[in-house]
Each structure stands twice: as C-alpha cells, then as structure tokens.
Amino acid sequence: LGTDIISPPVCGNELLEVGEECDCGTPENCQNECCDAATCKLKSGSECGHGDCCEQCKFTKSGTECRASMSECDPAEHCTGQSSECPADVGHK
C-alpha cells in the first residue's frame, strides 16, 4: 500500500503538471509571453512556451543545432521542427 500523496494540478505554481501546457506562475508574475497564466495553456497561435527548440512561441526550424558536439563520438543534436525539446543526447562508440 503506497503512501504517496497525489494532489491535483495547480495552475500558477510554476510547475508543469498533468493537463497544463505551461505554468509561468501567477498572472501578475508571469514572464512568458507564450503562456496564458490564468489557464496554464499556450496562448492562441503559440506552438510552445519553453525549451531549447522554442523561439518566440514557435518551434525552431528543423535542423537547427540545439546541443553542440562534445567529441567525434558525440554528434551534435538538432531540433526536429515538431517539438520544443532538443532530442536526447546520443553518443557513438
């Protein structure tokens, strides 16, 4: 029997929780132009609100480098154009 406390998501607590597209804090404190702080949803026309592959509320174009190569065994990662997150870091042996 687990003792974990599960609480419903709270919009405005700056934690991205289930059902939220963004959470930038209270409407008075929100600094994210892509996020509607009152609803924790992206504003109309926004594709994203944060991430290495998100610029001005839009996904960065496909092929844009988001993580530099660290060595010949660690190629650079590039944005997909379909997500605000940089793909997982992949290394070659």
Curated annotation (Swiss-Prot):
Keyword Manganese on entry: no
GO biological process: proteolysis
Pfam families: Disintegrin
Note describing how the cofactor binds: Binds 1 zinc ion per subunit.
Principal place of residence: secreted
Matching SMART domains: DISIN
Keyword Ligase: no
Residue positions binding Ca(2+) 1: 10, 13, 15, 17, 20, 23
Stretch list, region Disordered: 74-93
Biotechnological utility: This disintegrin-like domain, or derivatives can be considered as possible nextgeneration drugs for treatment of melanoma.
PTM characteristics: N-glycosylated.
Annotated ranges, domain Disintegrin: 8-93
Obligatory cofactor(s): Zn(2+)
Entry EC no(s): 3.4.24.-
Molecular function via GO: metal ion binding; metallopeptidase activity; toxin activity
Oligomeric form and interacting partners: Monomer.
Record function comment: Snake venom zinc metalloprotease that possesses hemorrhagic activity. The disintegrin-like domain has been expressed and named leucurogin. This recombinant disintegrin is able to inhibit collagen-induced platelet aggregation but not ADP- or arachidonic acid-induced platelet aggregation. Furthermore, it inhibits the adhesion of human fibroblasts to collagen type I. It also reduces adhesion and migration of human fibroblasts and inhibits migration and proliferation of human and mouse melanoma cell lines (BLM, and B16-F10-Nex2).
Protein name per UniProt: Zinc metalloproteinase-disintegrin-like leucurogin
